[in-house]
Structures are given as C-alpha cells and as structure tokens.
Amino acid sequence: MTQDEVQQIISYAYPLIQSKIKSEFGSGKGPIPRIDTSHKNTYAMHSGEPEATGEHDETSIAEYYKGTIYLYLPNIPNEKELIIALIHEYTHYLQDITPLKTRVANQEYTYDTNPYEIEAHKNEESWETFSQN
C-alpha cells in the first residue's frame, strides 16, 4: 500500500472505530491516541536507527503514556490488516492498561489467554464494518 492509501484508510476508518468502540466500552481516560506511521518497527522506533530489526516485528504497538498508536507499515500488507491493527490498539487504549497491570497480566497469562488480548481480538472480528470496500 502507498502512504496515500494508508492515510485514506486511516482517515476513513479510525473515526468510525472510535465511535463504535467508544459507544460499546466508554471513553478512555486520556486524549484519543494519534496515529504514527513513521517507523518501520518497534526496534527502529526505540533505537533511533531506521534500519534496526529484531525478532518481534509487530504490525502495531500503542504507547498510551505518549498518546500514540504506532503502525509499522512494512508489516501491514493490506487494508484488512491495517484496520485490524487500529481496532486492536484502540481497544487497548480504552482498557486503561497500566504498566503494573501489564506486568501482572504477563505473569498470569500467555498472550492467547490474556483477557486484554482476548477482548482486543474479539473487537477485530468487526473489521469489515470499517472498510470502504
């Protein structure tokens, strides 16, 4: 996808995602997270080295204390995966997950049994609702 295509999808889908998920789960405590697509992965973002790589090249991550959802476009091949990443991270924003809650959840659950992840994945199922196609 081109940067223009990505921006068009975000501009269309993100407000709809916010509205639907907010109506079902309420508002988050902070401002609505902005979307940042300027890094190719989490290693490049945190190291400051644009070409840095590692074993966990995810499609997205949210850093709520910074009020930002980071989308790693090289790992997002199409509209479906882009919308799923937006839904997933916006759901986490509304869950009010603190660093302590994250540590406890990571100790008590695997990724697949973590209640925060289960809820985010369940919300992803409605991705077609936010597609322009």
Language model features with spans:
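Short alpha-helical functional segments enriched in proximate histidine and acidic residues
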Residues: 20, 93, 123, 127
